[in-house]
Design a protein with these regions (language model features):
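Acidic/glycine-enriched connector segments
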Residues: 4, 13, 23-134
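Glycine-rich beta-strand-to-loop/alpha-helix junction loops that act as flexible
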Residues: 19-21
Length: 134
């Protein structure tokens, strides 16, 4: 994010994955959560890594566009991998980020997989639990 966090010295430059449940749609929550973590930790995000799915992934892409950040999207190759495609894509996302922001409803298996992959690859994962309205 090119904002106050970028004006501090000794920022840690980061590629950030933004992942989460497909029914997550609160862009303001996403921005506020990421912004606060970046300020608290002196992070300077230069690139967003996404999986291209609806929900949190698409909001992450919007975030990248709004803040003029580089965007890398790893789409699932359903023809090549079949039902495993989402999980294969998740590995690509986590391998290609420095930190991860996961917006999780507490149920999504794909988001849980991302969180677990962060542990496997020793990547810092910030998890924001949310409840759907309605």
């Amino acid at each position: 994010m090119h904002n106050e966090a970028n004006n501090k010295q000794d920022n840690e430059i980061m590629r950030a994955a933004i992942v989460g449940s497909r029914d997550f749609n609160d862009y303001n929550m996403l921005v506020e959560y990421i912004y606060n973590i970046c300020i608290e930790n002196n992070y300077s995000i230069t690139e967003i890594v996404s999986g291209g799915a609806r929900g949190a992934d698409k909001l992450g892409e919007q975030f990248a566009n709004n803040y003029n950040l580089k965007l890398t999207v790893f789409k699932a190759d359903w023809n090549k991998y079949g039902k495993r495609a989402g999980f294969v894509r998740n590995v690509d996302i986590i391998k290609n980020c420095d930190i991860c922001f996961a917006f999780w409803d507490g149920e999504s298996h794909g988001t849980k997989h991302d969180i677990d992959l962060c542990k496997d690859y020793n990547k810092k994962c910030y998890i924001k639990l949310f409840k759907n309205k309605g």
